[in-house]
Amino acid sequence: MTPRLRLQPESVGIGMTSQRVRDRLVERLREAGIHDEATLNAMQTVPRHLFIDEALASRAYEDTALPIGHGQTISQPWVVARMTEAVLQVTPTKVLEVGTGSGYQGAILAALGLEVYTVERIGDLLRQARKRFRHLGMNVRSKHDDGRIGWHEHGPYDAIVVTAAAPALVDALVDQLAVGGRLVAPVGGASSQSLVQLTRGADGTIEQQVLAPVTFVPLLSGMLD
């Protein structure tokens, strides 16, 4: 897969210095075990600095989570890459993201040419993310709603990416996963979380695998404007 962006490199801030820091980030991701070239190309291409506050722009290509307001964060690049790599293994076409946040994870998926549906419970974050999607020419379908219920109208999905942690996998989301599809989500509480992938077999059986220890904000119910 080749990342798809409408803007020219200069429009997304790929100057000499910016390209070097992106290259270094990709090399760090390789060293940390990310091997899927499509994922790495998307991580190199999508301008992470556009998804954070300007005051933090100098840290945009560090492999660390950063605050985006409302008690939320933009995930660590390694985590974004690992979740993306995991869902690409089932060759998805249609993906549901639960927790739009800054829009960065959704942008990575959209840059890979996937049909992306994303749900965010915090209205202000969703409005900002939509502006970024438009700026980058990305056709990401978004909804202001309680992410725990998913987006049933457009299901089932080949892949589901959950960007906030619940004590257990949410049944309503698992039910929206297509046969042969994969769901990747952080599971656990404040003190201990694991990144879990769940794959629905052709016979409907569910296979679950723990990928890595992680730290995410909690998956909450309800909506905020």
Curated annotation (Swiss-Prot):
Organism placement in taxonomy: Bacteria, Pseudomonadati, Pseudomonadota, Gammaproteobacteria, Lysobacterales
Top-rank taxon: Bacteria
Enzyme class: transferase
Catalytic reaction list: [protein]-L-isoaspartate + S-adenosyl-L-methionine = [protein]-L-isoaspartate alpha-methyl ester + S-adenosyl-L-homocysteine
Name of this chain's protein: Protein-L-isoaspartate O-methyltransferase
PROSITE patterns per record: PCMT
One GO CC term on file: cytoplasm
Annotated GO biological process: methylation; protein modification process; protein repair
Its job: Catalyzes the methyl esterification of L-isoaspartyl residues in peptides and proteins that result from spontaneous decomposition of normal L-aspartyl and L-asparaginyl residues. It plays a role in the repair and/or degradation of damaged proteins.
Chief localisation class: cytoplasm
EC number: 2.1.1.77
Recorded family membership: Belongs to the methyltransferase superfamily. L-isoaspartyl/D-aspartyl protein methyltransferase family.
Keyword S-adenosyl-L-methionine tagged: yes
Matching Gene3D superfamilies: Vaccinia Virus protein VP39
Subcellular location: Cytoplasm
GO MF: protein-L-isoaspartate (D-aspartate) O-methyltransferase activity
Pfam families per UniProt: PCMT
Keyword annotations from UniProtKB, A to Z: Cytoplasm, Methyltransferase, S-adenosyl-L-methionine, Transferase
